[in-house]
Structures are given as C-alpha cells and as structure tokens.
C-alpha cells in the first residue's frame, strides 16, 4: 500500500516534493492503515495518570497533589490538553493507573466506552497476527514473566474484556479506574514496581488503544500526568540508549539551580542502583521498566503496542511520551521471537520493521533528552512551537497536520485528472532540482 500511495503522490498535479513532509506522512498513514486515504478525522488521546515515589527526593517543583488535581481537571477540559482537544473536537480517555491521592468515586468508571453497535476489527490474538510478533501465546520467557504476561502483549489477558462492544465514544467527564496501586516506589532507593505490575500497566494501555479502535477512532495520541515523571523518563532513556544520565537530565516543570543538581544526582544514583540490581538482565526492557519507570510510562508503552496491533496511527506528544514510545519499541523488539525458539528473545522473523513505523512525533520538546529519544526511534517531529507542557498537548495540533496530509492524497487531482500535460517535469524528476 505504501508503494501505491507513493505512486499516487508522484502523479498529483504539483512539482515533485512540493508539499514536503505532508507527502511522506500521507504515504506512512497508508502503510499503517492499509488504505490509500483512510478516515482519520475522529481522534482521541489516551492520558495515563500516576504518581511517582521518587518525588520525595525533591526532583520536582510541584507537589504530588497536582497529579490528582489535573487528572480531575482533564475530565472538565480545564488543562492544556483539555482546552486544545476541546477546540479541535478530540476526545480524551483519562485513566488512573496509580494516582496517589484519592479521587471521588463518582468520577470513576470501570468501562470508559459508550457501547452500542458493531465492533471495528482489531487484533485479539498475539501481535504476531499482524506480522509483528511480540510475545506468542506460548511465549512467556523462561523463568521470567508471570502467566498473565502472555495475554498482556497479546491482548488476551485476564482483564482484557474492555472494548468487547463498540460504541460512539469514550464517556465524557469520567476517569477509567485501572489503579494498580497509589504511586510507585522511590526509584532512588528501590525498584519502582514489580514486573507483574509493569505488565498490568502495559495491558491497561493495550486495552485503551484497542478500545479506542473499536469505538471507531481513526487516530490516537498518548499523553500523561504524573509529577516526577521527567525523572523516571530520563532514567529509562539513559538505560535504553547508553547516554550518560547526567547529560540528558532536564529541568522538567522548572527547578532552581540547587534543585537541578539534586535531580541530576538522583537520576544518576537511581540508574546505578538499578544496574546493580539488574545485572545481566539489563537487556530486558520490562525488567528495566519495572526498576526505573512509572505506571504512567508503562501504560503509555502498552498503548503504543496496542495501536500497532490495531493498525491505528498513533501520535507521540512530548518528552515523557517519546520515552514511553521508545520503551514500547524496545519491548517490541526484544520480545520478537524466532520460529524455533518460541518465547525467547531472538532474531526478528520476517521483514524488517519497527514499532515506530506506526508512530508520528508531534512536536519537538525543549526537555533536554527529547532529541536523544526521538532520534533513537528514527522519527522527526512535525512542529517546533517551543512546547514543553506534556499531557498530550501536542497531539491535537499534530492531528490536523496528519488530516491535511490525508486530504491531499484523497482530494487533490492527478495531472491526468486535471488535464495537465506533465512532460515539463521530466527533467526535474530525473535530477536534483530542489
């Protein structure tokens, strides 16, 4: 389909390459969805909220209570992503995977969707069903993952009932209650979570993406809320890329000089502790995630994996979102299996591809480690707006760029349709004229 899309782009009535990255985006969208000009006008953002125990080390200027407050404010469209998504007609699926402070029971829902009608198709077996093996039905690594982990990445886990029916959208004003527990542990002193908890969070994100697909959304974004999560993100980024932690520590929501030095020390110390604990398991991304991540990041990673399983284009927001995307990419790559060693990490079978092939980077974050993460994914952000808010706030703007790319593919005439002789472009097409 990508070849067909590229061929049509070459036939559109314009100088070759004159629409720049819109042309590349339209071809990539066609490859993801299997449609030349899919309907991507219905969009939603999955926002994962959780607190981080490392906050107690003084790595953030904001109190932990902000996580709860903003999670509630998402439902009222009073946050940055709330206002932007409201303006662009984008829905929010707000999920509590580990908020510390109690949220009123009346705001919670066990089923985020309004369920009526027939379900859209979405992979329900292993991700291998779409040619992208992560973990097969038999594929629990020896001595490692819990049994539930088979279903987590395959979308068939014990809690995978959500989205069994399709509907008209997510419930407005509600928070999906998938709280694993109130906040992670302090990664400076101990592992953030158990691997079982990491898998539950990944499963939640997978289910979120699958639910949104079944509800008829044509494109999704991934956002977050969790005070202290630039610290956890930086630790994961350092481990996944090998870049020294001190070189990629940023100031997050803002820090004094003393606070910044403290944050660098905490990130470096947390990485040293985790590396000692992990030993030869440092190559296992789920083990690394459990040591240094957060419930929010784990759930976001699951959403990226779920989007790929459903052939659903997914947009990355800023720094935390791009590190979660890299986490998903590492998990996906590590757990690809060979046909002769089911369940064991090995050489990828089949054609070369990456989970990042399903992703779009929305905007360049000013957070220090962003460029390292996005380059590791092989992606290029669409927008340079000086943004560094998070929440998923870059996604609604990027959605419109992607919509525009699809509109060009769908509505623009070819030279033949426009009755224009394009012979004058022959020399330009052969040479380096731009």
Identify the function of each model-found stretch.
Residues 1-151, 155, 161, 165-434:
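N-terminal loops that bind phosphate or other acidic moieties
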